Amino acid sequence: MNNQKQQKPTLSGQRFKTRKRDEKERFDPTQFQDCIIQGLTETGTDLEAVAKFLDASGAKLDYRRYAETLFDILVAGGMLAPGGTLADDMMRTDVCVFAAQEDLETMQAFAQVFNKLIRRYKYLEKGFEDEVKKLLLFLKGFSESERNKLAMLTGVLLANGTLNASILNSLYNENLVKEGVSAAFAVKLFKSWINEKDINAVAASLRKVSMDNRLMELFPANKQSVEHFTKYFTEAGLKELSEYVRNQQTIGARKELQKELQEQMSRGDPFKDIILYVKEEMKKNNIPEPVVIGIVWSSVMSTVEWNKKEELVAEQAIKHLKQYSPLLAAFTTQGQSELTLLLKIQEYCYDNIHFMKAFQKIVVLFYKAEVLSEEPILKWYKDAHVAKGKSVFLEQMKKFVEWLKNAEEESESEAEEGD
């Protein structure tokens, strides 16, 4: 028996054809570029004709594969080399953003070209966002006029939702920030964005991508202050953006104040230390006293676990608030602060149903402890209260208010007799 393995026959000199689906098309952006530029040259500067050409070409050319090349051409007139320069040996077109007039109306017209293209070929959306992020990193490679056009275009595209505000991350590039390119670009961008929408819409878009608290990073670390930001953008004609950032900073400072205040209270820090800290924060962050009393009130009320039984919670509240009266009194030196506190108490007692019967007792306690005075209480009773539970609370306060009025009249007549 032959134990040797039988040799398998081989086919020599035979060539096998690769299946069509296994063939990989060669990546050739130059050929794609030539087709697009030739078409744009034929359409000329009529942007409606450009939009129609791009719409029709998507059926013949591979936009999905050559998205970056397509957008390079539409923005810069040709394929961009790293750093943002146009290759000398490549074809170029003047039918592009950078060769257009430097005005908002022209950029709005170009924005429509991008809108139509991306609406027609939805898969280009991601590629376009990546392109804009790249272009922002290349800003130093562009002329000032090119940067201005790109900024205006980006602002319009952010306003109409073609772009997501996350693209602004590219502006926080260290080199762009250090050389002042980011801040200058942001001025033009926000002007066109706010011109299309308003500051509230801009703020909502920034909040959506957690960019609302990062705008100061457009400046180097040594210039990241509210004062510098507001001065720079107000002088550039963007007062509403300056005010928005100032408000954001104030909101952040208030949250930080409340957090620190609650920690100090839970540690049992002396009131004099807490008062000193709060007053320093008020001065540093320009927080008015009526705002601070609201923060102190909610901090005081959140430091205790309240009894769920209505008949016991009033007694517990009075005991707790009596202890904190000196702290509250330190921040009711203005009539408006007292009125704010009264409204906070009203809202708290309404929102926490077990406190509904405690409202009058809390107000009387604060009157005796000189946290509240007659005039704001009478004003609250007459016309400064809010709708929440007003019939219940006004009824509770009726006798005390009558007593206050009588006491006031008696003191007035005593003063007249003394004269």
UniProtKB/Swiss-Prot annotation:
Disordered: annotated segments: 1-26
Cellular component terms per the entry's GO annotation: cytoplasm; membrane
Any one Gene Ontology molecular-function term assigned to this protein's record: cadherin binding
Domain W2: start-end pairs: 247-414
Residue positions where N-acetylmethionine is found in the record: M1
UniProt cross-link Glycyl lysine isopeptide (Lys-Gly) (interchain with G-Cter in SUMO2), position: K368
Matching CDD domains: W2_eIF5C_like
Modified residues (Phosphoserine): S12, S411, S413
Keyword Transcription: yes
Regions of compositional bias (Polar residues) in chain numbering: 1-15
Annotated GO biological process: regulation of translational initiation
Key words, A-Z: Acetylation, Activator, Isopeptide bond, Phosphoprotein, Transcription, Transcription regulation, Translation regulation, Ubl conjugation
Similarity comment text for this entry: Belongs to the BZW family.
Job of this protein: Translation initiation regulator which represses repeat-associated non-AUG (RAN) initiated translation probably by acting as a competitive inhibitor of eukaryotic translation initiation factor 5 (EIF5) function. Enhances histone H4 gene transcription but does not seem to bind DNA directly.
PANTHER family: BASIC LEUCINE ZIPPER AND W2 DOMAIN-CONTAINING PROTEIN, EIF5-MIMIC PROTEIN 2
Listed name of the protein: eIF5-mimic protein 2
Species of the source: Homo sapiens (Human)
Organism lineage string: Eukaryota, Metazoa, Chordata, Craniata, Vertebrata
